[in-house]
From Swiss-Prot:
Subunit structure: Part of the 50S ribosomal subunit. Contacts protein L32.
GO molecular function annotations of the record: structural constituent of ribosome
Gene3D superfamilies in UniProt: Ribosomal protein L17
Keywords: Ribonucleoprotein, Ribosomal protein
Name of the protein in question: Large ribosomal subunit protein bL17
Xref: InterPro entries: Ribosomal_bL17, Ribosomal_bL17_CS, Ribosomal_bL17_sf
Encoding gene, per UniProt annotation: rplQ
Length: 180
């Protein structure tokens, strides 16, 4: 059963808070980042992340659940067509809050909330690890044929004893250079 928000609400009544969060989420999905007060950004973060999780699933039921909260169909289409698939391989943490300097007029603490647009650090690290492993494997494969040719046993057509270190080649008499 839904419980009302305890403590102070943004804008006074619960209906006004729902409207504020819906409008902030619409602006966030439309522009990618917004500047707002820090309490509004903190309240918006779980609200927006739940909507993105619905968009990742992509079913008609999820679209209708999001349409109950966001009234702009263009933003909902963007959410389901672009934002949801972008975060398909990410489990949460779709938004980032960055504190900025206080607002000049009333000294309210301000923050920027934005969608995280770069891939995760771990996926970048995994990609770098795979590339390094592939390069090491290629280097090892390139080194293997030279080792095989050095350690190759003598075949039937080879001269026996020519590769032995004790075998001496027949000595030829030294030839003297013609004098001019």
């Amino acid at each position: 059963m839904p419980k009302p928000t305890k403590g102070p609400r943004l804008g006074g009544s619960s209906s006004h808070q729902k409207a504020i969060l819906a409008n902030l989420a619409t602006s966030l999905f439309e522009h990618g980042r917004i500047t707002t007060t820090e309490p509004k950004a903190r309240a918006l973060r779980p609200y927006a992340e739940k909507l993105i999780t619905h968009a990742k699933k992509g079913a008609l039921h999820n679209r209708r659940e999001v349409l109950k909260k966001l009234r702009d169909k263009d933003v909902v289409h963007t959410l389901f067509a672009e934002i949801g698939p972008f975060f398909a391989d990410r489990d949460g943490g779709y938004t980032r809050i960055i504190k900025i300097e206080a607002r000049k007029g009333d000294n309210a603490p301000m923050a920027v909330i934005e969608l995280v647009r770069e891939k995760t650090v771990t996926s970048e690290a995994n990609r770098a690890r795979r590339v390094a492993a592939a390069q090491a494997k290629a280097k090892k494969a390139a080194a293997m044929p030279t080792e095989e040719s050095e350690a190759k046993p003598a075949e039937e057509g080879d001269v026996v004893g020519a590769s032995e270190p004790d075998a001496k080649a027949p000595e030829e008499p030294p030839t003297e250079a013609p004098e001019n």
